C-alpha cells in the first residue's frame, strides 16, 4: 500500500517553569480526554504503551455510524507517543500518528506526524478534518499548560497553511 504522510507543528507558547515540552507531553499522556478533541476510551484513562483504545467521535457524532476507531499505543517516550490504527479504524489498519513535544526558540511546540493510504481518496478529506482536530488539540494543550495568551500570530497563520494539503503532504 502506498503511504503518504502529513505533519503539523503548533506553537504552544513560551517555555516557563510550568510549561516545558516534557511537562506538556506528560499532561497529554495523563489527561488525553482533556487534550484530544474526541473521546479516548479503553484499557486505561492515561496513554500507556501496548494498550488498545477506542477513539470516539473522531469524524463526527457516533463516527457517522461507522463505530469506534480502534488504535494501539505502539511507542512511548518522555516527549512522544505513537498510535497505530487497528482493523475497523476509518483510516484502515496499520496507519500511525506520532505526537511529540519539543522546545525551540523559547517556545513549546506540539507536532503531529501521521501516515495514510495515498490510494484512498477519502484519506485526503480525512486529512482536512485531522488538521482541524489537531489545531484544537494544540489549543487544548495551551489551556492545560497555561500558555493560551502567549502563542503568537504565527500559530494562527500556521493553522491556515495547514489547511492547504500540498503544504504538509509528502507522497512517496
Task: Please identify what each model-predicted range represents.
Residues 109, 115-171:
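A conserved amphipathic terminal alpha-helix motif
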Residues 13-16, 102-104, 115-117:
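Solvent-exposed residues in well-ordered beta-strands and their adjoining turns
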Residues 65-104:
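Hydrophobic-ligand binding "helix-grip"
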Residues 3-9, 80, 96, 107-109:
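Intrinsic-disorder/low-complexity, polar/charged segments enriched in Ser/Thr/Lys/Arg/Asp/Glu/Gln
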Residues 60-65, 88-93, 118-124:
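Short, cysteine-centered beta-strand-loop-beta hairpins and adjacent loop/turn segments enriched
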Residues 84-87, 110-114:
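Catalytic Cys-His active-site segments of thiol-dependent hydrolases/isopeptidases
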Residues 1-64:
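Hydrophobic ligand-binding cavity/cleft-lining segments
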